[in-house]
Amino acid sequence: MPELSRLVAAPSVVNIGHGTLNTLSDILADPALCPGSRIVVIAGKNSSQEVTAQLRELVPDATWVTAENGTEEAAQILATELRTTGFDLVIGVGGGRILDIAKFVAAANQWPSIAIATNLAHDGLASPVSILDAQTGRTSVGVTPPVAVIVDLDLLKSTPPAMLSAGIGDILSNISAIA
């Protein structure tokens, strides 16, 4: 028997590369990852037209919601509103704030989620934590990590240089933290 044991929740699928957004169809076809066809996409108001156009082709029947406010209260309201409709899966598309909202909404409703990153300046793509703004500052909320993470390098070409540099810094800090 091990002296120390730890179970770490992690995504089942992590697709990073050129054109990986197209792997979404395969992920959605897997009933172990996507238990149904009722999908809600949570995106930011500044989401790239290119990304949203591609996603609308890949999930034409999805319901789209724009998340404008990264507060815990707004995320709770959104989770409650979406619960009344009932979905099988949440797809978050955007940067850190949007992906944290999507993870929170999914966890609050016990739905799986998929994270589609549109920038790298976020060190919590696959983490079991959502960081949301609260009245007293930022709060960390435990959530279920996404079942899949997609980072399509073709979508990152238009990332502003400052965000790209911040993302590289996040990656390096995570590597050193693990080591």
Q: What is each residue range found by the language model?
A:
Residues M1-L89:
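ATP/NTP phosphate-donor binding region
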Residues S12, A108-A179:
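A glycine/threonine-rich phosphate-anchoring loop and its flanking beta-alpha core
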Residues G17, S25, G94-G96, G167-G169:
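Glycine-centered flexibility sites
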Residues L24, S48-V51, R97-K103, H122-L125:
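Short glycine/serine/threonine-rich phosphate/pyrophosphate-binding segments
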